[in-house]
Amino acid sequence: MNSLIRRGLVSIRTSTVIKPSSFGLMRNNRFYSTENNQEAAKPEETENKPAPGSLEETIEKLKEELEETKKQLLYTAADRENVRRFAKEDNEKAKKFGIQSFTKELLEVVDQLEMATNLFPKEKLDENKELKDLHEGVKMTEQLFLKIMGNQGLQRFNPIGEKFDFNNHHAIFELNDPTKENNTVGHVVKQGYKLHDRLVRPAMVGVNKIKPQ
């Protein structure tokens, strides 16, 4: 009985023993598997690794973008400065010429006063004190208006005898006076006005045009 049991144990041990050749095969398979995994990982690492020269190209591109950004900032700053300057000029013009429409209305009053002073017969002013006082009162009123408007930059000009200038003169008729130069202002109907060198109203004039004999 005991001998039978021993034989069975020996038989079991013999059947479960791992042969050396099988162990070596398993170890080789494990080595090959690890090697294959490492080799498989190499292509991925190569793909993630930057190509030669790509870093320099990226730096150069960033420099170009930085320069472009600087230019845009300079352009923006220049535009803002221009807007600020134009706004300042517009404000100054508004202050200087804001009364232009108002002065045009006052010109009619001054024209009437000027016309009134010219209606007084000069030869009788010294003979008639009341007439002379009235003339002086009208003249003083005219001068007061001119002074007030002058304080605001409005100036009157009389172009008699000057060369005709279509920028400042408006011809309403022609003269033929051989004693005066051709194409000059021979008569002034209404004097002209400027506001800070800007023409408010041209002078209404008669131009001398000498006709050939």
From Swiss-Prot:
What does the UniProt keyword field contain? Chaperone, Mitochondrion, Transit peptide
Q: What is its main location?
A: mitochondrion
Q: What residue range does the UniProt record give for the transit peptide? A: 1-32
GO cellular component assignments: mitochondrial matrix; mitochondrion; PAM complex, Tim23 associated import motor
Localization of this protein: Mitochondrion matrix
Q: Which domain of life is it from?
A: Eukaryota
Q: Which SUPFAM superfamilies match?
A: Coiled-coil domain of nucleotide exchange factor GrpE, Head domain of nucleotide exchange factor GrpE
Q: Which residues form a coiled coil?
A: none
CDD domains xrefs: GrpE
GO molecular function annotation: adenyl-nucleotide exchange factor activity; protein homodimerization activity; protein-folding chaperone binding; unfolded protein binding
Q: Which PANTHER family match?
A: GRPE PROTEIN, GRPE PROTEIN HOMOLOG, MITOCHONDRIAL
Subunit: Probable component of the PAM complex at least composed of a mitochondrial HSP70 protein, grepE, tim16 and tim14.
HAMAP family, per the entry: GrpE
* Family named by the database record: Belongs to the GrpE family.
Name this polypeptide is given: GrpE protein homolog, mitochondrial
Upper lineage:
Eukaryota, Amoebozoa, Evosea, Eumycetozoa, Dictyostelia
